[in-house]
Amino acid sequence: IPFLTGHDVNQDMRAAQVSAIREAFEECGILLATDMRTQQMINQERLMELQSCREPLNKGELTLHEFLESNNLALSCESLTHFAHWITPSMMPKRFDTHFYVARAPEDQLAMHDGYESVDSVWITPEEAINQEKEGKRTIIFPTLRNIEKLGEAASVSDAISMSKREEVIPVLP
């Protein structure tokens, strides 16, 4: 498939990986993609040039394929490590089958919330997030809280990635 890098991309997980990278770009402005002209992960300067594409992608006015092709990009699926898999209970009116990934954000890319799906952003530790949720200062839905707790077991991004590579991801259906 064009527009994907990494020969070891799990075929069964490809759609979930593509969705994860797309969502990260649309909602927080981080794009795990390689510039096909340079064969390098895009930097902040290139990311800023692509910011105007976030809203059209989100609204469905621009397809991901069109975005990647017109900007000479390939999604870096190999930079994702499968972290968790949550499935909404069957009694819920809206159901989701969601895979979560952990990845190192490119050092020179700065996250920016989109103002629609994510309207605020803050960098805090997992412990701080959990404490704020317990104190009623922050509302965190159950799957997110469990994922944050799991991330809190890691001492660093590298540790979280290593931990995720070692552990089998078991689907959770509360």
Which stretches of residues belong to each language-model region?
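The catalytic Nudix box helix
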Residues: 1-76
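Short, P/G- and charge-enriched loop/turn segments at secondary-structure junctions
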Residues: 88-90
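Active-site rim elements
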Residues: 7-14, 131-139
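Hydrophobic/aromatic-lined pockets within catalytic cores
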Residues: 25, 29-32, 134, 152-156
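Core RNA-modification/binding signature centered on pseudouridine synthases
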Residues: 142-174
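Terminal peptide-recognition signature
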Residues: 24, 101, 148
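NUDIX/MutT-family hydrolases
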Residues: 66-68, 73, 77-86, 95-108, ...
